[in-house]
């Protein structure tokens, strides 16, 4: 290999490392919001419940995030909304489940309004 090839390969490798670490910086609460948004977009109750469970898992994990400040009141209210979304989704009531997931998103966004990220 010549020097230009080695330099090009090294540059690509460094860019790949930095871009993958940038992707990994989403907080658990950010991921909870993403899954709740997917729940709202789902058409079937079971799918809403599935995404809501994933959202709830990340929301609970966010309680251990040390990098950001989270308003626990809104976080807990969002988790309660997800519980409703899961229950309604499991019962096949997609519309009510979507509404509850929408409420969860609102609570999670309020929980992060005064964060440092």
Label every model-predicted segment.
Residues 1-24:
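Classic N-terminal secretory signal peptides
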Residues 20-117:
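Long, charged/polar, soluble alpha-helical segments
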